[in-house]
Amino acid sequence: MEKMFSLRAHAAPVSGFCPWENQLVSADRSGTLIVWNLSTRRPAARFRAHEGQVLSMQPTRFGLLTHGRDSAVRIWPPGAAENSKGGDPHPIFEMPVNALNFCNVAYIDGADGTALLATPASVDSDCFDVYRLSPDFSLARAVENQAPKQEQRGADQIEEIGAPPGRGEGIIMRLAWAAPDLLYVGYESGALASFSLSPEGCRMLWLARAHSPHPVLSLALEGARVYSGSAAKTLLVHEPPHEEAVAKHNLGHYGVQCFEILPHLYLAGFWDGSVAGFSRDWQQLFSLERPHEQIEAPESPSRKSLCLFVWSAPAAPEQSRRDRLRSRRAAGRLLFVGHADGLIVAYAIDESSENGLLES
């Protein structure tokens, strides 16, 4: 299995990807965003979005939402990438958030043109807030400092000696919307909680601790199912309204830090930098390893993979034959893997192949 191509422009470790305006955007730990032309494999635009690592990126109806370690959430307007050629563009919206941990923020479209934004709480990192964002960018806090019900803690849980009483499930690690009225939250303790939002308020539906004591690192949704990866080798599958996991899988590597779901394939990235593909019946199909391209000095940045993203090429408008030939390189699904030395490697995903990746 061979890689398709590499993208080289980041001077810091790659921290994430997302699609925006039919282009691929990558972010790094310096706060830089790069918009890529996948036909030429070169940056189409580049700008500094944050003073520190970009933790979250998501396209929205308002523009590109980014969230950084500089304790800010910003929204960049459509066309910001083009405008960046004359200098860094200006966000059309900005709000402060709690970024004491590395938790993401989660956005989802709501009713009447509004949107919901879940963030770590302003007061406590083990709680969350939910804001309602209006089309005019006015904010209203819908949920404040929400934590799991303390009575849900089991008698069999062991507290550390000297730990403050009632500290709950530890800091929030991951947030994921399933619907505008359903939010999943992963905790440092290994707990996964489901919350229901309504005009009457927010209430916890269930809380499961099958990952404990290993922190939740990743959340992914497929229909009614929620997949959660932890600092251990375990990936759990929950199917509401059941509190207990309906499936538990040992993926063979510690730290399931990212997880992607395809119709025929599961993809997982781990702390050791490896990326593995699994069939829908959880047989490992392949493991991606980055080849050594040159002799490296001991002080060189780590080559470990840090994040992955599946890109689906947008429907192309009418093109000339020459343009069609150039864009064929970027056609279909591509798996992008971001590395700690700033390199991005792309692999072609073959929808008809049993092993999931295109063989050369």
Swiss-Prot record:
InterPro entries, per the entry: WD40/YVTN_repeat-like_dom_sf, WD40_repeat_dom_sf
Domain of life of the organism encoding this protein: Eukaryota
Keywords associated with the record: Chromatin regulator, Nucleus, Repeat, WD repeat
WD repeats: 9-46, 49-86, 167-205, 317-357
PROSITE patterns given in the database record: WD_REPEATS_REGION
UniProt GO cellular component terms: nucleus
UniProt-annotated location(s): Nucleus
Disulphide connectivity of cysteines: none
Annotated function: Component of the ASTRA complex involved in chromatin remodeling.
Oligomeric form and interacting partners: Component of the ASTRA chromatin remodeling machinery complex.
Family: Belongs to the WD repeat ASA1 family.
Name listed for the protein in its UniProt record: ASTRA-associated protein 1
